[in-house]
Amino acid sequence: MNDEEMKNALQSLRDRPRVPADRREAAFERVRSEWQAALATQPAIPARTPTRRWALGLAASVMIVLFSGVFFWMSRDTASSHTQIATVLAVHGGNAFRIDDRIYDQQSIKTGPTTLSMRMASGLVVRAAPNSELRFSDEGHLQLEQGRIFVDSNPRESNAPLLVETELGAIRHLGTQYLVEYDRERLNVAVREGVIALQKPAETRSSTTAAAGEQLIVTANAPQAIERSRISATDARWGWVETVASPIDIDGMTLGAFLQWYERETGHRVTLGNADANTRLSGSITGLTPDDALAAIAVAVELTVAQKDDEVVVSKP
């Protein structure tokens, strides 16, 4: 079996995800060397005999097992030599990620069809939309190669700082919720709550801030110019974020506490009419979007829900 045939036999194992390319190639070359050394010690066998084909098939099987062992070793080594940055909190679509999966520094995250929510040790939550590519350099730096992310830095928690880096600029939060959309040609940062600071690559000592309801746009054609405009907290561009809302256990929770969660997850301002904020809830809303959860609770405790623009009014009938 020549090198090309061996590569084809090992292709599925060689291309498995989440193993750094340099380690994967080093392991492959190691297997290749051991393969050639093993062949060199074997006596010559006539090329056209069934025995040789059987022997090569057996050898290929042995090498696949060997390479599987190398892959397992590399996976264990990768996990043990890196720092855990976050844990998967919620998943929508696809099957590449599962709740409670660990996310490590330097790990390449490609969401594909999946919407993903990750909670960092500090409590800060990062959500990634489908077809996004990102990587945590360490606990304080996230590199967005392309796609969309939503950062939720809850001011009620002691969140550590996070710098989101792209080729068109870097963003840091000052206690906020914000959306970053980046496709290499255009960077858009929209703020739903709090304040962010955008620093362009060429400017290390100055930055441009944006507050809730504002968005900043930078393009590759004019990287030194920043366009500022308004954006609603309930704009359609925020919609994907709600598919991986932060989990909440409503059993025993008050209606008022649930509505606070709803406000933060959707951006809607909630007005409580004649309904009692201390009403105790029961059951579960696992798997429901915030809007569906509110609708289910309204039926359970006999409430009416009316929406007008950015405001949601909850009251007794």
What are these regions (language model features)?
Residues 36, 43, 62, 246-248, ...:
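Amphipathic alpha-helical interaction segments
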